[in-house]
Amino acid sequence: MSLDTLITHNTLLPATPDAQPDACALVLMGGGARTAYQVGVLKAIAAMIVAQLPGKPSPASPPPAFPFQWLFGTSAGALNACYLASQAVHGLDALPRLATFWSALRSERVYRLEAPGWVRANRIVAGLTLARQVRRHRALLDTLPLVDTLHRAIDLDALERALAQRIIHVLGVTASSYTTGEHWTFCQTRPSHPVQPWHRPGRRAEFQPITIEHLMASSAIPFLFPAVPLWVDGHKEHFGDSGE
């Protein structure tokens, strides 16, 4: 997914004539470690915004406004984008809240490998155990812990409120269809947004409510995490990490 693609298809155009002409877009790439670095940068941006405020804000004063109106992400970057969108109703506090979320994240809240420690001592047994894991979960790792983590962390109702209140305009999540090989950008806007789905060689865009399934599809690393079925064009296709 590129910013040029989003601009070309008018995804970043203001939804209404009275929308802010200087609104900002945030496009977040994937990659676990890189995504953690993104959190640090965003936390620093929040601190710089606060430092530029006139006077010293009191603890009782409301936080500054959320600084981004268009959020797009792929893979782990999509998780960050969606989390921020769901926290946008809290203004600038959304950025340090994302850092708090990452600080509490542990591997057991992301995946589960059903193999006792003693299995590693025998290559044959380890191979058989991993093969059983693949048959059961369609991948090496069980990602149900991540599903639970995202359901607990991301308030999709708050995301809809942020869109309805025009705090944000668009949330976009990209994923690759293993069925067709096309890259999809799933976008959620408020109902009055005029942008229509678009299609160009190898790339599609669909406007529909973002769900945890979209996030799991975008972050489904091939072979490690299972592909996720999503409904597109009236049928199911299996999606995974777009690698973009």
What are these regions (language model features)?
Residues 1-27, 178-194:
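Small-residue-rich anion-binding loops in enzyme active sites
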Residues 13-18, 59-65, 156-165:
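Surface-exposed acidic, glycine-flexible loop patches that form ligand/cofactor-binding
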Residues 14-18, 54-58, 220-221, 228:
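Acidic-glycine-rich active-site phosphate/pyrophosphate-binding loop
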Residues 20-25, 33-144, 150, 187-200, ...:
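Patatin-like phospholipase
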Residues 30:
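Extracytoplasmic "Venus flytrap"
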Residues 137-175, 182-186:
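Active-site periphery "cap/insert" segments of enzyme catalytic domains
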Residues 164-244:
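Active-site gating loop/helix substructures
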